[in-house]
Amino acid sequence: MKKMKVTQFKSGAHRLKSHKACLKGLGLRRINHSVVVEDTPSTRGMVNRVNYLVKVEEA
């Protein structure tokens, strides 16, 4: 399955609870933290919801 690298570049503090939950679901904890996740519709949805907080690259 395809993978993608997601990097958090903005803080999750003072954001909507649902956006904080998406960051937690992706495994992101702090600024400049990167994780490699599978490219599935559910992870794409989480990334799209917090697209102003993260950068996405192919892994």
From Swiss-Prot:
Q: Which GO terms describe its biological process?
A: translation
One Pfam family hit? Ribosomal_L30
Q: Can you provide one Gene Ontology molecular function annotated for this UniProt record? A: structural constituent of ribosome
Q: Report whether Hydrolase shows up as a keyword of the record.
A: no
Q: May I have one GO cellular component term? A: cytosolic large ribosomal subunit
Keywords, sorted A to Z: Ribonucleoprotein, Ribosomal protein
Does the record bear Kinase in its keywords? no
> Which Gene3D superfamilies does the entry mention?
Ribosomal protein L30, ferredoxin-like fold domain
Top-level taxon in the UniProt lineage:
Bacteria
Disulfide connectivity for this sequence is: none
PANTHER family linked: LARGE RIBOSOMAL SUBUNIT PROTEIN UL30M (PTHR15892:SF2), MITOCHONDRIAL RIBOSOMAL PROTEIN L30 (PTHR15892)
Q: Which family does it belong to?
A: Belongs to the universal ribosomal protein uL30 family.
Q: How does it assemble?
A: Part of the 50S ribosomal subunit.
Q: What is this protein called?
A: Large ribosomal subunit protein uL30
Q: Which organism is it from?
A: Psychrobacter cryohalolentis (strain ATCC BAA-1226 / DSM 17306 / VKM B-2378 / K5)
Organism classification, top ranks? Bacteria, Pseudomonadati, Pseudomonadota, Gammaproteobacteria, Moraxellales
